[in-house]
């Protein structure tokens, strides 16, 4: 039996080849582990999905609460602004109502020519302040009677009047903006029904006389 000669270099090559195989195997296994870890990371766990759904539901609920709170605030601010305006208007109404008797006295004094000198300056300033708050007076002789604006204290027929009109102003009326605070107290004149009848009678007499003249006119035969 003959012994084969063993080459040391061949043994070393085999060892190197085995080491390379081991390294390649380790690399492949490592890549597989990394891919598995990456897949596990990319696919959320059921617990994470449940947590995300809870957060989304909570966010939607808080958003709805915020929108509701914002709407309530807008309504509250609108109500406060309205109440503030009403309160201010109520204060103006009270002051103007208290001033009306003074303004009546001033109007009467002006009719008698008693608003002169320094007193006139005070009167003009007072009326200016009242006008700045929207107060206006109304009621003049010759105005067509309006029951929404005038209170008739006296009423009498008058010739030459075609519609019921103001013939005398006892007390002026006042408006605050478009709202009537007090109607004007007036005497009114109505069309005279007797005068109308007399006019109609005169017209009828005239037509009758004209007809008689036509009857008496000779006719050419």
UniProtKB/Swiss-Prot annotation:
Residues 194-205 have a biased composition (Polar residues). InterPro entries: GrpE, GrpE_coiled_coil, GrpE_head. Its main location: cytoplasm. SUPFAM superfamilies: Coiled-coil domain of nucleotide exchange factor GrpE, Head domain of nucleotide exchange factor GrpE. Transmembrane segments: none annotated. Residues 1-53, 180-221 are annotated as: Disordered. Keywords: Chaperone, Cytoplasm, Stress response. Residues 14-26 have a biased composition (Basic and acidic residues). One of its GO terms (cellular component) is cytoplasm. GO terms for molecular function: adenyl-nucleotide exchange factor activity; protein homodimerization activity; protein-folding chaperone binding; unfolded protein binding. Residues 210-221 have a biased composition (Acidic residues). Pfam families: GrpE. The keyword Chaperone applies. It is found in: Cytoplasm. Homodimer. This is Protein GrpE. It comes from Cutibacterium acnes (strain DSM 16379 / KPA171202). The gene is grpE.
